[in-house]
């Protein structure tokens, strides 16, 4: 059909189907952990037959090795308005082991320098508790919280920014989300000032007018 009408939309649709086929063909191999060594599984704390965040971290490493360029991992259950002490202990143990194993594994395999690892969420938690008794927790808090980056040309061992004595507001080297985006785009080789989209007659930047690359974070 494409040879008859030479419609680029038909060619695009054909390529989409071909890409989907290649991805489906590769998926069973990617998720087969039987080829991983016992030492690797123990390092991640993975039971191949049970879903876990650590298992997802190991799958992420396998996807990176296979050439996947963007991977997003989710971990649910952090909305800790109650039962914070009990729930966070459990979740931190599960997450810390998997993410530490992933970073170490990427470094051992020579992949960390070309892989940018980003850890964080859309907000933190208040430094004061809500609720009472054994069911206390912390509310949403966007005014001062932490994210971390590893690999991908990021300077290791660097702390950027500081909160007040209560841990409530960021007061030193405050970093806006547009600064974060500008820095990440820079590490991906994209000039954030030229990455624009047009809406209602004018150009907009994803990093707005104030976003800047935070060079103190770069190796």
Region roles according to the model:
Residues 1-219:
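Ligand-binding pockets and gating/stacking loops
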């Amino acid at each position: 059909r494409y040879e008859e009408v030479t419609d680029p939309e038909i060619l695009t649709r054909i390529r989409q189907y071909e890409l989907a086929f290649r991805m489906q063909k590769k998926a069973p191999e990617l998720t087969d952990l039987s080829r991983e060594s016992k030492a690797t599984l123990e390092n991640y704390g993975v039971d191949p037959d049970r879903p876990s965040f650590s298992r997802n971290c190991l799958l992420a490493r396998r996807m990176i090795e296979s050439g996947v360029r963007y991977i997003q991992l989710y971990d649910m259950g952090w909305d800790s308005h109650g039962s914070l002490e009990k729930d966070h202990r459990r979740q931190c143990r599960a997450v810390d082991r998997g993410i530490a194993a992933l970073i170490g594994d990427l470094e051992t395999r020579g992949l960390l320098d070309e892989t940018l690892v980003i850890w964080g969420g859309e907000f933190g938690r208040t430094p004061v508790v809500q609720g009472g008794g054994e069911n206390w927790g912390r509310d949403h808090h966007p005014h001062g919280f932490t994210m971390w980056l590893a690999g991908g040309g990021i300077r290791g061992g660097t702390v950027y920014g500081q909160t007040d004595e209560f841990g409530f507001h960021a007061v030193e080297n405050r970093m806006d989300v547009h600064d974060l985006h500008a820095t990440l785009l820079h590490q991906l080789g994209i000039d954030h000032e030229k990455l624009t989209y047009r809406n209602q007659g004018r150009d907009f930047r994803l990093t707005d007018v104030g976003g800047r690359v935070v060079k103190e974070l770069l190796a």
